Amino acid sequence: MEAEPERAEAPRRGGVAAVLKMGRRARQDIFAGENLSRKNSPSASLGEVPPPKPPRRQGGWADDPVLAPTKSGRKHAEEVEDHRLRQQSLEASDDGGDIPVIPDLEDVQDEDLAMQVAAPPSVQVNRVLTYHDLDKDLMKYAAFQTLDGEVDLKLLTKVLAPEHELREDDVSWDWDHLFTEVSSELVTEWDLGQSEREDHISLP
């Protein structure tokens, strides 16, 4: 109750300069008054050491330029980032070890590709056995050696057709020519069938 009249009398005493302080300033004045009262107390005069003060952080979230929402804080953060990028770019430009060296055309020797021959590909192919190889394999077996010169192949040769009858000449096919040949063969077969039917009908 006593503090209220003192606050009311403060503007009367000091005028405009003695206006009550609000917020952080008022807390600082209160802490200063408490420190003075502790120093003047009899415990301080007896030599008792006051407890150590906890570390006090100066400033607040507004002091961080990166996290500040104001335009000035953003500009400051952008300037810091630009400064870092500029330093890196200058350091990279000073270092000449990463720059590749391009040779001149005179130093490059033209390779003669015409004289170079590519190696043939190695492909595994199953070799076909010839008759000579087959005869050698046949002679290895002792069971077939007794038949040498005694085998009669006349029955087999009677059934086999000669080579010139099996091979056909390469003839180019024409649509009109093929059509006429097929149609003529069909007509001849039809005529033969008709004549055979007439013969069967005429017989009693």
UniProtKB/Swiss-Prot annotation:
Compositionally biased tracts (Basic and acidic residues): 1-12, 75-85
InterPro entries: IFT43 (IPR029302)
Localization, UniProt: Cytoplasm, Cytoskeleton; Cell projection, Cilium
Pfam families for this protein: IFT43
Residue runs in coiled coils: none
CC terms in the record's Gene Ontology section: cilium; cytoplasm; cytoskeleton; intraciliary transport particle A
Chain segments carrying region Disordered: 1-103
GO biological process: cilium assembly; intraciliary retrograde transport
The organism's place on the tree of life at top rank: Eukaryota
Keyword Cytoplasm: yes
Entry keyword set: Cell projection, Cilium biogenesis/degradation, Cytoplasm, Cytoskeleton
Known function: As a component of IFT complex A (IFT-A), a complex required for retrograde ciliary transport and entry into cilia of G protein-coupled receptors (GPCRs), it is involved in ciliogenesis. Involved in retrograde ciliary transport along microtubules from the ciliary tip to the base.
Subunit structure: Component of the IFT complex A (IFT-A) complex.
PANTHER family: INTRAFLAGELLAR TRANSPORT PROTEIN 43 HOMOLOG (PTHR33724:SF1)
Homology family: Belongs to the IFT43 family.
Name used for this protein in its record: Intraflagellar transport protein 43 homolog
Organism this protein belongs to: Taeniopygia guttata
Taxonomic lineage from the root: Eukaryota, Metazoa, Chordata, Craniata, Vertebrata
